[in-house]
């Protein structure tokens, strides 16, 4: 469960290292974001000499959460940290590599570019 003021790790090589969620997109009073949701975030830490800078406002897709994800077949998926992938306005990832295994639900939500870059789909 990601809510405003939650710090997120970045799971790609876009240039950001840590994000802070400032808004959850989708509804005006939505409280939590889960895997596959788009959030507006601000960059808290960035790699030097990259296109992204600290305090820049960006969009990101949640790919890992500490809160468990329950599937209809009874499988429960839970990660050790909260992480996101930086995207542009069209929903394409800004990075060229993704460093973690991601959930199958992202494919159903039409984030096929992110799924194709991931090393493993759970």
Swiss-Prot record:
One GO term (biological process): translation
Record has Membrane as a keyword: no
InterPro entries: Ribosomal_uL14, Ribosomal_uL14_bac-type, Ribosomal_uL14_CS, Ribosomal_uL14_sf
Cross-referenced PROSITE patterns: RIBOSOMAL_L14
Record has Ribosomal protein as a keyword: yes
Any GO molecular function: structural constituent of ribosome
Record's subcellular location: Plastid, Chloroplast
Domain of life (superkingdom): Eukaryota
One GO cellular component term noted in the UniProt record for this chain: cytosolic large ribosomal subunit
Main subcellular location: plastid
SMART domains according to UniProt: Ribosomal_L14
Recorded family membership: Belongs to the universal ribosomal protein uL14 family.
Assembly, per entry: Part of the 50S ribosomal subunit.
HAMAP family: Ribosomal_uL14
Job of this protein: Binds to 23S rRNA.
Protein name: Large ribosomal subunit protein uL14c
Designated gene of the protein: rpl14
